[in-house]
Amino acid sequence: MNDTEHLRKKQVANEDGSDANVLFVLTGFKAFQTVQHNTTEAIANGMKQHLTKTQSRLVSRIETMAIDVSKKARDALNELCQNPNVIKAERVVFLHMGLDHDTRSFKIENQAYNWLCDPERQLEEVIVHDMEQTDMLETSFDTEALKEKMKDSFDTIVSHDAQRYYCNFIYFCSLYELARESDKYRSLFLHVPTFGTAEETCQMEYVAKLMETIDDEMNKE
């Protein structure tokens, strides 16, 4: 970053020192199959209200969407990119969430693979045809550093396997179509436990803190 760019970034910073040019796009998944109430849909739909209630600095810098658990997730991603606030933002962080019934921790996913497996629809295929099935893309965020900053809030681990269902699908699409194509976009995926493991308020607070932590780190760059 040259001196002119750094000066311009400082001029648009918020009074609290955070970067006003970083917009967060938070996505969760809708109900599907045996999951009638998806934890991530509730978090996505309730996050703006939570940020308002807690007077978070991010309240005016977030867009949210609950998306279908299907290949339509790719269309939803493209739709989000056409959001006027996303278009005008200087930097955008896509934070995708998925539900993991078996985990008792928050799982920060480091990477996604070029493979989709949907047993219900008898579907197995590569996501991007100019890459191999075993190819993977990694987030540009330092997941180990994020884990260290988040582990005091709730048990947090770094995962290197987002499985091959639609969590992996949306993450790979996001990394391939957005983060790889433009420095404006960065992507991260978070697997969350059920509300039975970590209640809704706890999860709201965790996700909000994760975004604020990312915001802090990006402000240092």
Regions found by a protein language model. Give the residues of each.
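A generic structural motif
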Residues: A31-F32, T194-A198
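A short acidic/glycine-rich loop-to-helix N-cap element
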Residues: A198-E205
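N-terminal catalytic or cofactor-binding beta/alpha core of small enzyme domains
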Residues: N2-Y165, L175-K184, E205-Y206, E212-K220
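A structured phosphate/pyrophosphate-recognition subdomain
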Residues: S187-T194
